Amino acid sequence: MAFVDQAEIEVKAGKGGDGIVSFRHEKFVAMGGPFGGDGGHGGSIIFKVDEGLRTLMDFRYNRHFKAQPGGNGGTKGMTGASAEDRYIKVPQGTTVKDVETGEVLGDLLENGQELVVVKGGRGGRGNIHFATPANPAPELSENGEPGQVRKLKLELKVLADVGLVGFPSAGKSTLLSVVSNAKPKVAAYHFTTLSPNIGMVRLDDARDFVMADLPGLIEGASQGVGLGFQFLRHVERTRVVLHLVDMSGIEGNDPYTQYRKILDELGQYDETILNRPHIVVPTKMDMPDSEENLVKFRQEVAADSGLPVQPEIMPISALTREGVQPLMRLTADLLATAPVPESYRPVVEKVSNDKTYDFKPEQHNFTVEWSEETEEWVIGGAEIEKLFLMTNIQRDATIMRFGRQLRHMGVDDALRKAGAKDGDDVRINNSDFVFEFSD
């Protein structure tokens, strides 16, 4: 039994550090020249598979992830410190998609496998890189490149670790609703659950697992009666079984008789299920006759020589929550050492190569639009916006360099073709400039 766990998050890589303008000022060193260092690289965000994780629950509480920026350059040609990459643990079998494009960035299938999902910006260059014979003392530097930003959709096809079995109305749906994020329909009548409800259980110690409330079993299920085969196939793929038994004795039902009927059906379908780690969970201990019925039930189970092993018995009341947390902790302990059944197959297929995602540079695409509201030309485009952010607009020399870069990209020609005239206002990334066409 598999279901798809999903989460949408935003990841933002670190900006590169800024290069600086600096000059060598030392005694006896005339005309020392430029000495400004480069900025350090920003941190990337990298997903890494941790086979100990079972769900995407962590991403429901934390949807925004940022890496640190690189350090700015220093004097004497010193390069700023590069930021450390940020590693985020994901479960085995996670598929990563770009929300905006729908592109699959990668499938993370092997323990320890890594995938760079956003790449940190490179550091801006200091003025030491811009010296030429014509300009031996440039006041030019670059700001750091912005880090990449992406909205990602994570998908994980999950198999239930723990299966809740028992007769209809044994309290399976109620227990699941108490310990997990699932919201099954719960009512006081038989056959409440006709298809599996699945929830993710998270303990205080950060352990988590997937629990399934399986369709109520009836006598004859191993021969296909009712939901028989469908139910038993679900049980077959769980690693730990919690066998819920109603202790209330309502409608004259005998707890031990019901317990034995479930075991018989499981054994007739597949005897190996009986050897799987399991806990017997007497339920509805808040009811008037439950304590008395539990004493009798324990005696009958202890005297049953036909059981493969004497089971752990942990009574609970889902209504009052009594015994629920100890039960969940013991369940997690069993899962830590439970063998993986043969039927517990991986449910993802590898659709892309194991590789770091190849980030392709942006094309020279930009837009030129006239804004009636502000009466100015608006220039847009990812590459232009990146160039602007890497331009130190506090220095005239770098602004002039930015103008030359735009001209080289064809922005001047596009403005002139669109009808721009000398003196028109031009807005780029919320900053205003005056258009002057150069031949």
UniProtKB/Swiss-Prot annotation:
It is an enzyme of class 3 (hydrolase). Pfam families: DUF1967, GTP1_OBG, MMR_HSR1. GO terms for biological process: ribosome biogenesis. Its cofactor is Mg(2+). Mg(2+) binds at residues 173, 193. Residues 1-159 form the Obg domain. Disulfide bonds: none annotated. An essential GTPase which binds GTP, GDP and possibly (p)ppGpp with moderate affinity, with high nucleotide exchange rates and a fairly low GTP hydrolysis rate. Plays a role in control of the cell cycle, stress response, ribosome biogenesis and in those bacteria that undergo differentiation, in morphogenesis control. This is GTPase Obg.
